[in-house]
Amino acid sequence: ELFTQEQFHFIAEEVSSDGGLDKEIDKVGLSTLERSFRALIYANLLSADANQQSIFYQELNAGIRNVLLNQGLHYLSKEKDTTGFSSQYGWVHAFAHGSDLLTEVVCHPDFPKNRVHEVFDILGQLFKRIAIRFTDDEDWRLARVIYEPILQGKLEQEQVASWIKTVDFPIEE
């Protein structure tokens, strides 16, 4: 572990204290870069909090954990900046990092199985709302939102099949 428990708590408090992933959600560029990497920090905090082999297992304050879970669940439904790589900033990757975060949210032991339908709603809306084709590895990271919870027993394949049957995805030839 590269952090002490004190540092872990400090990072969790700081990253969630000023609006979190909702901060400047309507702005792009540097604001997106900050949100994107904040999403990665959220994902790592939740991963450590959920990992029974980690010294940080269940170490997040319950209030902060709930903020991370709730903001992580809804982040991709709010993010608009689809920049993958920027010549000015490097990798911005908000949708890839947001997908990594959503995967950690769904797989976290404190995320109830009966809320999986919200994840399906968010993904369905995302596929309808985003007009571009992702080309910077966002696709497989979005796929992880579905297959990691299946592998961890948080989601049944039948649930995914039922959801796919109900969604009218726009398909381009």
Stretch-by-stretch model annotation:
Residues 1-6, 10:
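N-terminal carbohydrate-binding/catalytic regions of secreted carbohydrate-active enzymes
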Residues 11-161:
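Eukaryote-skewed repeat-based solenoidal scaffolds used as protein-protein interaction platforms
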Residues 155-173:
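CBM-like carbohydrate-recognition segments
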